[in-house]
Amino acid sequence: MEFKDVFTEKRRSLGLSQNDVAEKLFVTRQAVSRWERGETVPEVETLKSISRLFGVSINTLLGSPRTLICQSCGMPLSDDFMARDTDGAINESYCMWCWKDGQFLQQCTMEEMVEHCIPHMPLAAQDPEGCRAYMRALLPTLERWK
């Protein structure tokens, strides 16, 4: 989906008019109309405000061009599981179980994170060593552990 489609769908699902959105974002109703027609896309700062207003990530607003994973534990991220920063903005880098209010929830080593994640993996019961090997290869590639 394109931004115009995602934006329009989210606005309508929240029961907001174009004018309501314009007032909340401090833009004109004409700007909102142009976004919905696909004539323009908002600037980055406005995208952040829309993200907060609609409760979705910028990645989702832009049609999910990237597959996001938590940069601490490697869990695939959807809007429902993304962390929030102290200002309430969605943090697209971490899941809600690793990050809250600008800090990591677990102060742990990489190996402790591996062991913490294994029970939550779908194949943990059948192949715990395979899961362990996968996590040991994945975690060093993530921002928290670089």
Language model features with spans:
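Short basic helix-loop element that most often maps to the first helix and adjoining turn
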Residues: D5-K24
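Short metal-binding segments enriched for Cys and/or His
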Residues: W97-H116
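Short cysteine-rich clusters marking metal-coordination/redox-active sites
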Residues: C70-C73, C95-C98
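Short linker/helix segments within small regulatory modules
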Residues: F81-E92
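Recognition helix of helix-turn-helix/homeodomain-like DNA-binding domains
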Residues: L25-V41
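DNA major-groove recognition helix of helix-turn-helix/homeodomain DNA-binding modules
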Residues: E45-T60
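Conserved hydrophobic/aromatic packing and binding residues within compact polymer-binding modules
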Residues: F7, V21-A22, V32-W35, L61
